[in-house]
Amino acid sequence: FNPFAAGCANPGIPVDVSGNKLPQSPELSYSIGLNQDFIGENGTTRARLAYRYMSEREGTVYNQPHLQIPEHKFFDATVTYRPNDGNWFVRLEAKNLADDRYIGSWYLASGLQGGNKFATVTDPRTWGISFGTSF
């Protein structure tokens, strides 16, 4: 008798996943941005518009169609002001301007947890302000 040995009534059925695509690994992912500087008497304002793309990808190692994660497309924008006579900046930013929501990832619970599937959802449109300095 070994009190630390855990027996398992059903060890499961082996599944061959060789040749399957890696989960959470898109075939294509990129971002592109446009910057424009506006030089004024008191400082420089930089505007940036960016586009982020990630192609569809597998949600799990089993490559099941109902667990695929759809492609993601996001537009982001920032406006940064830097004064000519200072070593600081202030930045306004917005991410996911279109407020698009996607499945971000899948999580499959074990049979002990009922075998349910859970998903994370990408962030909604977010706004922010930041301050910075250099020294």
What does each of the following model-derived ranges do?
Residues 1-76, 121-125:
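C-terminal extracellular loops and terminal segments
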